Amino acid sequence: MNHIRNFSIIAHIDHGKSTLADRIIQRCGGLADREMEAQVLDSMDIEKERGITIKAQTAALQYKARDGKVYNLNLIDTPGHVDFSYEVSRSLSACEGALLVVDASQGVEAQTVANCYTALDLGVEVLPVLNKMDLPQADPDTAKAEIEDVIGIDASEAIAISAKTGMGIDDVLEQIVAKVPAPRGKPDAPLRAMIIDSWFDSYVGVVMLVRVVDGRLQKGERFKMMASGAAYEANNLGVFTPAQQSRDALEAGEVGYIIAGIKELKAAKVGDTITLEKKLPNNLGPATEALPGFKEIQPQVFAGLYPTEANQYDALRDALEKLQLNDASLHFEPEVSQALGFGFRCGFLGLLHMEIVQERLEREFDQDLITTAPSVVYEVVKGDGEVIMVENPSKMPDQGKIQEIREPIVTVHLYMPQDYVGPVMTLANQKRGVQMNMQYHGRQVMLTYELPLGEIVLDFFDKLKSVSRGYASMDYEFKEYRPSDVVKVDILLNGEKVDALSIIVHRSQSQYRGRAVAAKMREIISRQMFDVAIQAAIGANIIARETIKALRKNVLAKCYGGDITRKRKLLEKQKAGKKRMKQIGSVEVPQEAFLAILQVED
């Protein structure tokens, strides 16, 4: 065990994490040069294109150090984005060390800070590394000062590297061997292994990536999950180098995979502990307590996904089920909307997660989708004291039956150059934010706000990028539910509610939002043969109205002079026809109308 080193890499998007991983794998001969490709560990196309890592991946590498000994290095690649923060914390807790990669030309960013704090909380040894030193605008001194200021770890011995050219890679490996502690585990205790990640393979079922903490697991042994109690047989186990390589046993301190013919990803939850099923003569039996830190992931953001053609419903369900095989944090259930027909209510970890799911559905499964406005989960206390969770505006009970509504509040860390503090604070205040803290680190400022999650999910991130010209970065974590004066605004067309257009907003903005949506609808819905009234209402109170005037045919064109009664008869006849049409005619709500809600500007 003394020759094992488990480490991961923490970095902001685009600071060169995957490139560094490629270099380390190449240096340790993990893949032959012909198998090397850019971003080896990012296996999904969308990961490569967006330059982000979504699922954790690993590589077990052999490195011959300068002291002549051979070390087993386990590189555990972590996702870097705030939506996947639970997966990050699980990946990090499987390591003893982490490389903090900072782009020497840009300095520290908010997500790096968030993940770095997670690592320090878990007691992981953090080694700072300055990447992109081959760039002319690299400024190592400022970057070092920022690391010390913001994260508070000593950066005087930060290693200068360039992952692109391969400079300094050996120094990094030597530092890992020298500074990262060997795994702390008991080889002779009952088996305990933590699931770092799991994914679905169409041939063998679920593949679990695990870190063995105590004991050992042999091929063919039966093991059980401690959270669910389900038991399976380990048909196949081994390590990734990043290519799959079978072994007979996984020992304490190692990181490897287990294949046990599990059909559903839900059975292998990230963060769960694996132990042996029962005591046999040749083993130590099950462990008594699970490893700490496991929690069920709760979706934070909900949106409706509907197929554009009604006959595509089954195809969409298949696509979602297949996606769920590889993404246990995606929740969905069927729902029916009067306006959009059959579809699904989906729950996501955050906005990036939602975008990725949508993009994968469109790209990998050729689905044409309509997405309703994203909403968050509200806690509603009904008149009789019952508490329900409402994740869909159309499910909100009537105003009269509600005692109070609580909305989710998140703590947001905003990180930006000091020139943009003003505009960013204005934006946060518009979104009902409460400032909690403000710290200066050199030229960078870190603002801490408490904001309602409902204000963030719509367009906060885009606005933040535009007011700070792209320099600000943010990360957020859920804090609590808090009573709030929010109301549901319904949109009516000719007195009929259109459920998919309902929104939940704070009372102070309800008038304004209602008017804005009604005005937007007026632009989008085409003119009919009769007047169309668009109304926004809170309960029975109408707060805004727009009217789309009818198209009109001139029935008097054929009359010439003559008696007024003749003209009046024709006009009355037209009026009666319009009235009859208005009673039976329905208004087609075009696709754009549902997206328009998202674009209603503040």
Swiss-Prot record:
It is found in: Cell inner membrane. It is an enzyme of class 3 (hydrolase). One of its GO terms (biological process) is positive regulation of translation. Residues 2-184 form the tr-type G domain. It comes from the Bacteria. NCBIfam families: lepA, small_GTP. This is Elongation factor 4.
